[in-house]
Amino acid sequence: MPHIIVKIAEGRSQPLKQELADRLAATMMDVLGLDSSAVSVAVEDVPMQDWMQQVYGPDIETAGERLLKRPGYGQLASPPEE
């Protein structure tokens, strides 16, 4: 029963967020071999000026080994790809 929570900078249209949710759900079903009834997706808009305090600090910096894809900004930035 996976539930995906996506936090994005506000300003995306509802159709774009729906497409994102549909694609994420489809990938989750494909990779984990799940039925669509098992997957749910929520999209949270975050004001850009609040991103570091509301998302980066509590969700990214404290994730430890759970953070499987690092961002390209902030203290935990991944090294540039060559």
Swiss-Prot record:
Family the UniProt entry places it in: Belongs to the 4-oxalocrotonate tautomerase family.
Protein name: Probable tautomerase XF_1725
EC numbers for this chain: 5.3.2.-
InterPro entries in alphabetical order: 4-OT-like_dom (IPR004370), Tautomerase/MIF_sf (IPR014347), Tautomerase_PptA (IPR017284)
Active site residues according to the UniProt entry: 2
GO molecular function: intramolecular oxidoreductase activity, interconverting keto- and enol-groups
GO CC annotation: cytoplasm
Keywords, comma-separated and alphabetical: Isomerase
Entries under Pfam families matching the protein: Tautomerase
